[in-house]
Amino acid sequence: MLLAIDVRNTHTVVGLLSGAKQHAKVVQQWRIRTESEVTADELALTIDGLIGEDSERLTGATGLSTVPSVLHEVRIMLEQYWPSVPHVLIEPGVRTGIPLLVDNPKEVGADRIVNCLAAYQQFAKAAIVVDFGSSICVDVVSAKGEFLGGAIAPGVQVSSDAAAARSAALRRVELARPRSVVGKNTVECMQAGAVFGFAGLVDGLVARIREDVKGFSADDDVAVVATGHTAPLLLPELHSVEHFDEHLTLHGLRLVFERNREAQRGRLKPAR
């Protein structure tokens, strides 16, 4: 059983995966709030409480964090509470197997890397990956499995909350699909702007990528896959997205874990 920890700015996903390679599957998943000042002990109490008896069945652990301080605590937690369980955390120096063809590879978030890795492994062709989180990341991986870069926009909830915080006449609303793109009250108007507006934003970015990037035209075979906790809200309004995989990041973490563990055992040549 593999423990996978995906720490983002707002929420943390904890998952358990059974099997390996093409037979791997996510058997449990939990979403908890990310606390930037959480300690290793607090993390251990929370995760041990979630996974229960499966704690004794762990054969490996892996994780990433877009919050550097939390990644440090995850490392301490694994070393102190599961010292016999091998672990691989996504950080500089870790083999991912995906070349980063960007100006500064160290700036690329670990979440973006593992998402593209998982998409390429799943579809075996060029892909555009849309991750709906605190930010919306639209990332591009070539037919050769190279990370080409992408675009980052504010997330749906973040933008909606910011609009409410900066205007006395607006308030925080529940993100839900309104009856129409033409809202009849303030809540519906904000929902329409969030749902239909961001669907248009993503469709526009995907269309621009397919126009501007060689090998991604309408005539090319390209997978467009979405992931992230707000993706289901927008999927019915998206025209460009063909696939949805809620476990894409967890599988990307698994792939990096497997690659590094096998490399350590000498069964793989070091990845680029």
Swiss-Prot record:
UniProt GO MF annotations: ATP binding; metal ion binding; pantothenate kinase activity
Binding of ATP, residues: D6, V7, R8, N9, T10, H11, T12, V13, S134
Cellular component annotations (GO), alphabetically ordered: cytoplasm
Residues engaged in binding K(+): D131
Protein name as catalogued: Type III pantothenate kinase
Residues the entry annotates as binding substrate: G109, A110, D111, R112, T186
Keyword Cytoplasm recorded: yes
Active site: D111
Catalysis: reaction(s): (R)-pantothenate + ATP = (R)-4'-phosphopantothenate + ADP + H(+)
Lineage of origin: Bacteria, Bacillati, Actinomycetota, Actinomycetes, Mycobacteriales
NCBIfam families the UniProt entry points to: baf, PRK13318.1-3
EC numbers on record: 2.7.1.33
Record text on subunit structure and interactions: Homodimer.
Cofactor(s) needed by this chain: NH4(+); K(+)
Primary localization class, coarse: cytoplasm
Cofactor mode of binding and number, as noted: A monovalent cation. Ammonium or potassium.
Function text: Catalyzes the phosphorylation of pantothenate (Pan), the first step in CoA biosynthesis.
